[in-house]
Design a protein with these regions (language model features):
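C-terminal amphipathic helix plus adjacent low-complexity
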Residues: 314-385
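Conserved N-terminal ligand/cofactor-binding loop architecture of enzyme catalytic domains
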Residues: 3-71
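Acidic donor-binding loop of glycosyltransferase active sites
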Residues: 246-256
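C-terminal "capping" alpha-helix adjacent to the active site of nucleotide-linked donor transferases
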Residues: 290, 298-314
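A nucleotide-sugar donor-handling region in carbohydrate enzymes
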Residues: 123-185, 214
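Active-site and donor-binding regions of nucleotide-sugar-utilizing enzymes
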Residues: 41-140, 148
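A short alpha->beta transition loop at the rim of the catalytic pocket in nucleotide-sugar-dependent
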Residues: 248-249, 267-269
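Donor-nucleotide binding loops and adjacent catalytic segments primarily
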Residues: 163-165, 172-248
Length: 385
């Protein structure tokens, strides 16, 4: 839409300090593996704005934000956009502490507005559904800054693919009920247990499983497939998830924000398993509340619950209709229009801090070094648990 525009995309924490990025990601993945319950408790606990955790986190983010200033000054952007809660808080710090009068937008990529996303100096919040708005207003966010435009996904999800051709390319039957199983690009969740349950269903179904980059999972499923009576196709990493979604009748998946959005656009009812405690559990609650999904977290009852759904054509039809109601296939276009409006009405490049001013406030050279050391020390302790 704007071929002459220049866009710079950065992984914020990685750009600031690759070591901190590795520790953060490593600690996050380890906490999910070792104690997902504890992670969920921390997520819930941090909803309170005044916890020790949030206070420490805010101070560290404030200290790290100064490292973005040279990049911003050199690039001279018309607008800053964040798609993560850390980055959103950094944008708020940039406006409040460094008086940068350029528009800042945050796109919340889940179906629940956790407090970690909500900060006072953001000009526009893009959300995925109406349910989020009242919570945000209660937390002090102005209604005038909240835009229910949806989560943007790849344009390919708006392209129509022929179900018959896709299934034929996999040597599957177009008339059979087709179930797609996914666990994200890493193939996470209890996919093996889910597949074993699917093989017990007393209906003529066929199964497609996408394992992403998880080669171990691919090999394990392939062994089970050899002794299964259900027609099954196992696919590794693919760039054609949209084609497979449009070819299936039911998607079994973890409730990640982007996967949910893609499924709603493709009008596919969902079966939810292995939600990450915290944000994915909140996503699941939204889907179940609006009859967009069935709950498969009790793996032992997975085949029973899917059979019930197969026997209720009206229920499936209602779920598909609900997907249409909550789908926002043109979110990307609508967000682009909002970006244009913000740039035209709120951008002031003269407010960029001068080079000599960048390191003056709070003596961030010294402050950042001490904060960085403290963060690494704290995160490494968590990583060692």
């Amino acid at each position: 839409k704007a071929p002459k525009s220049e866009v710079k995309i950065i992984d914020t924490i990685k750009y600031i300090n690759p070591i901190i990025d590795k520790v953060v990601i490593g600690s996050y993945l380890k906490s999910l593996k070792v104690s997902p319950f504890l992670y969920g408790k921390l997520y819930t606990y941090s909803e309170d704005d005044y916890t020790i955790t949030n206070t420490i986190s805010s101070k560290l983010i404030e200290a790290m934000t100064c490292k973005l200033l040279p990049l911003i000054r050199d690039f001279q952007p018309d607008i800053l956009i964040a798609t993560h809660s850390f980055s959103t808080e950094m944008l708020s710090v940039l406006k409040s502490k460094y008086n940068m009068n350029i528009p800042c937008m945050s796109i919340i990529t889940d179906y629940y507005s956790h407090s970690s996303w909500l900060h006072p100096y953001i000009d526009a919040y893009v959300v995925s559904n109406e349910d989020m708005i009242n919570k945000m207003i209660f937390k002090g966010i102005s209604k005038d800054t909240i835009y229910n435009l949806g989560i943007p996904v790849k344009p390919e999800f708006n392209m129509n693919y022929d179900r018959g051709e896709t299934l034929e390319s996999l040597d599957l039957c177009e008339s059979k009920f087709t179930i797609l199983v996914m666990g994200g690009s890493l193939g996470l969740g209890k996919i093996v247990d889910i597949y074993k349950q699917l093989t017990n269903i007393n209906e003529d179904i066929q199964i497609i499983i996408i394992t992403g980059k998880n080669k171990k999972l691919y090999a394990e499923l392939s062994k089970i497939k050899d002794s299964s009576s259900k027609e099954t196709r196992i696919i590794g990493f693919t760039n054609h998830v949209n084609k497979y979604m449009q070819a299936c009748d039911l998607l079994l998946t973890k409730p990640g924000g982007l996967t949910i959005t893609e499924a709603l656009i493709c009008k596919i009812p969902l079966g939810l398993f292995s939600p990450i405690p915290g944000q994915e559990e909140k996503n699941a609650q939204f889907l179940l509340r609006h009859n967009l999904a069935v709950n498969l977290t009790d793996i032992e009852k997975c085949s029973e619950n899917i059979e019930k759904l197969l026997h209720s054509k009206n229920e499936l039809k209602n779920m598909i209709e609900n997907c249409s109601k909550f789908s926002k296939p043109y979110a990307g276009d609508d967000i682009f229009d909002l970006i244009n409006w913000l740039v035209q009405n709120k951008s002031d490049k003269s407010s960029f801090p001068k080079e000599e001013k960048i390191y003056e406030k709070n003596n961030p050279k010294t402050f950042f070094k001490s904060a960085e050391k403290y963060f690494l020390k704290t995160a490494l302790k968590l990583f060692e648990l």
